[in-house]
């Protein structure tokens, strides 16, 4: 280990910045955020930097640096663009063992500034020891995207109840279990969702009952159309903390691999004319697993509230007062259309869009076909592969032009994506014998004309 990470308490402590430009200002923002009293020495000082110094009750010296400015400060940052000045500042600090950071010159530093993830009071520093600062910033960016912004509030909540938890749970093991349940369960999710009052009430109730019983919860998460990069941050976070995963056929393997390695996986997939697990049984499984105190992930392709029967699955949970969350996913219409270069609405072609289930009940159609013939409307049929011929012929029968452009998108957003473009009269014949497999999405309307020009995902 080249450096030992330490955290510096700078509240009301005098710190010196040598330099007055953009880099010096950037460093001053960090020190000011940490509560430092800022002193700046430089012939020219930016307006923002002067304001930061004034806000910290420090002083600005518009002159050249000399060693006397090191008196009574506890940290020095040299941020000039003159190498000779930076070298002198570093040498002066080393001589009196005063911590110094010289920007972009690790060899001159006695301390280095990490890339920072600030979720105060939770603070994370990432450094490459000055060897690869761009890489350190890249790692910081990855952490920023995976650590919810409200983690700071969660840490503050834990601090607020820390002493009381010690008083209630004198046994260290019980106290640890209590905090594990708090920080990994529904109470933490209340905080992350912005409901601090409800979180405090739940903690109060557990402390009043001196209970460490684990509370179950269900996460109804939309996995999107297939590409793992289309997952939301919240979806990924819940996927990685669930202990049991119930998933269906439309969840792609790369997305399934992003769940916890040790999570129990239960396949409840559905195919046309075949239900691996009946819907009512799925609902009951979610309830029973949550009642066992488990964190349960119901992972569904697309969006759970668009042809996903998500409302049915959480209805039983609500009746039994089981905590649950619903995380929307990018629905197939949005994802597949975007990856096919087909805008669902377009100033020249379509002023509205309609989502329709293409899953014909027992092979029969019960739609109001006359509502679908408007030329300025885009039609999107989900699960329409088996009923494709019926859908196309019925639209033509009720007045839709046989030459209306139509596209059948197969395995949209995935590397195997194929887009079959024709018109209402010819699409069914075009895909005959092509070994097309679900999941598919059918888009009908003049917006399909954009595919040839805008198709970027090839």
Swiss-Prot record:
S-adenosyl-L-methionine binds at residues 225, 301-303, 306, 331-332, 383, 412. Pathway: Cofactor biosynthesis; adenosylcobalamin biosynthesis; precorrin-2 from uroporphyrinogen III: step 1/1; Cofactor biosynthesis; adenosylcobalamin biosynthesis; sirohydrochlorin from precorrin-2: step 1/1; Porphyrin-containing compound metabolism; siroheme biosynthesis; precorrin-2 from uroporphyrinogen III: step 1/1; Porphyrin-containing compound metabolism; siroheme biosynthesis; siroheme from sirohydrochlorin: step 1/1. GO terms for molecular function: NAD binding; precorrin-2 dehydrogenase activity; sirohydrochlorin ferrochelatase activity; uroporphyrin-III C-methyltransferase activity. InterPro entries: 4pyrrol_Mease (IPR000878), 4pyrrol_Methylase_sf (IPR035996), 4pyrrole_Mease_sub1 (IPR014777), 4pyrrole_Mease_sub2 (IPR014776), CobA/CysG_C (IPR006366), NAD(P)-bd_dom_sf (IPR036291), Siro_Cobalamin_biosynth (IPR050161), Sirohaem_synt_dimer_dom_sf (IPR037115). CDD domains: SUMT. It holds the Pfam family NAD_binding_7. It catalyses: uroporphyrinogen III + 2 S-adenosyl-L-methionine = precorrin-2 + 2 S-adenosyl-L-homocysteine + H(+); precorrin-2 + NAD(+) = sirohydrochlorin + NADH + 2 H(+); siroheme + 2 H(+) = sirohydrochlorin + Fe(2+). Keywords: Cobalamin biosynthesis, Lyase, Methyltransferase, Multifunctional enzyme, NAD, Oxidoreductase, Phosphoprotein, Porphyrin biosynthesis, S-adenosyl-L-methionine, Transferase. NAD(+) binds at residues 22-23, 43-44. This is Siroheme synthase. It comes from Saccharophagus degradans (strain 2-40 / ATCC 43961 / DSM 17024). The gene is cysG.
């Amino acid at each position: 280990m080249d450096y030992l990470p330490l955290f510096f308490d700078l509240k009301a402590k005098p710190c010196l910045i040598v330099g007055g430009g953009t880099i010096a200002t950037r460093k001053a923002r960090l020190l000011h955020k940490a509560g430092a009293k800022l002193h700046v020495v430089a012939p020219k000082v930016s307006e923002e930097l002067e304001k930061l110094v004034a806000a910290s009750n420090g002083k600005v010296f518009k002159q050249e640096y000399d060693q006397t400015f090191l008196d009574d400060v506890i940290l020095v940052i040299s941020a000039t663009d003159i190498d000779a000045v930076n070298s002198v500042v570093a040498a002066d600090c080393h001589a009196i063992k005063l911590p110094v950071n010289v920007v972009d010159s690790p060899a001159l530093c006695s301390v280095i500034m990490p890339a920072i993830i600030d979720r105060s009071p939770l603070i994370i520093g990432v450094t490459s020891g000055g060897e690869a600062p761009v890489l350190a910033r890249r790692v910081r960016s990855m952490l920023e995207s995976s650590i919810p912004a409200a983690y700071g509030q969660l840490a503050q909540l834990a601090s607020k109840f820390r002493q009381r938890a010690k008083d209630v749970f004198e046994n260290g093991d019980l106290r640890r279990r209590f905090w594990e349940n708090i920080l990994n369960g529904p109470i933490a999710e209340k905080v992350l969702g912005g409901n601090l009052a409800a979180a405090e009430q739940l903690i109060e109730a557990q402390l009043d009952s001196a209970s460490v019983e684990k509370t179950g919860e269900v996460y109804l998460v939309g996995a999107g159309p297939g590409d793992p990069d289309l997952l939301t941050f919240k979806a990924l976070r819940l996927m990685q903390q669930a202990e049991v995963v119930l998933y269906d056929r439309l969840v792609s393997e790369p997305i399934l691999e992003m769940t916890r390695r040790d999570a129990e996986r239960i396949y409840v997939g559905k195919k046309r004319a075949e239900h691996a697990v009946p819907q009512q049984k799925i609902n009951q499984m979610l309830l029973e697993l949550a009642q066992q105190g488990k964190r349960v992930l119901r992972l569904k392709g697309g969006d759970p509230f668009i042809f996903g029967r998500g409302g049915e699955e959480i209805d039983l949970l609500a009746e039994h007062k089981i905590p649950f969350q619903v995380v929307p996913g990018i629905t197939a219409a949005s994802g597949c259309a975007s990856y096919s270069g087909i805008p669902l609405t377009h100033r020249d072609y379509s002023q509205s869009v309609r989502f329709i289930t293409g899953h014909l009940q027992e092979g029969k159609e019960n739609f109001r076909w006359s509502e679908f013939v408007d030329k300025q409307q885009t039609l999107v049929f989900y699960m329409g592969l088996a009923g494709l011929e019926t859908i196309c012929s019925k639209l033509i029968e009720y007045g839709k032009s046989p030459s209306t452009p139509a596209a059948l998108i197969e395995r949209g957003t995935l590397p195997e994506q194929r887009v079959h473009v024709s018109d209402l009269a010819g699409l069914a014949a075009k895909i005959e014998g092509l070994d097309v497999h679900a999941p598919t999405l059918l888009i009908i309307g003049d917006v399909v004309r954009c595919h040839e020009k805008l198709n970027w995902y090839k």
